[in-house]
Curated annotation (Swiss-Prot):
Homodimer. This is Ribosomal RNA large subunit methyltransferase H. The gene is rlmH. It catalyses: pseudouridine(1915) in 23S rRNA + S-adenosyl-L-methionine = N(3)-methylpseudouridine(1915) in 23S rRNA + S-adenosyl-L-homocysteine + H(+). Specifically methylates the pseudouridine at position 1915 (m3Psi1915) in 23S rRNA. GO terms for cellular component: cytoplasm.
Amino acid sequence: MRCVVYSIAKSSPLELVKIYQKQCKQFDCELELVDLFPKNTANAQKVSKELAQKSYSLAFEPYLNPKAKNIALHPKAQRGDSFAFSKMLENHLNINFFIAGAYGFEENFLKDCQAWSLSEMTFSHEVAKIVLCEQIYRALSIIFKHPYHK
């Protein structure tokens, strides 16, 4: 299995994420983080919400894979507990997660993904990545009946 987290960000909270990356390997899952912040995104965010969203879509579109499970983290999307999250990931070999910038996703981009919300609360990119990585590890623990998830 391969899970890739793509985000509009300049850097990742590496130390804690590295722990989850290592733990996921025991389930034969490669957990990768890819931070994207093209030059046009910084400029677009200064101009308008619409241009910012378009720049996010342009950054992410090359990574949308019709053969993979594509999941966009979106605050108004479906949410559930860790068991529901594990069911969503089960039986998929390649899973791409997308975390937009401050202005969120364009509706057109969301049509190409399953949307999922981690919480009703708003998180910084750093916290969202940590929570997502932990939940990926927890989902794998549920799928493989590992005692981490009790």
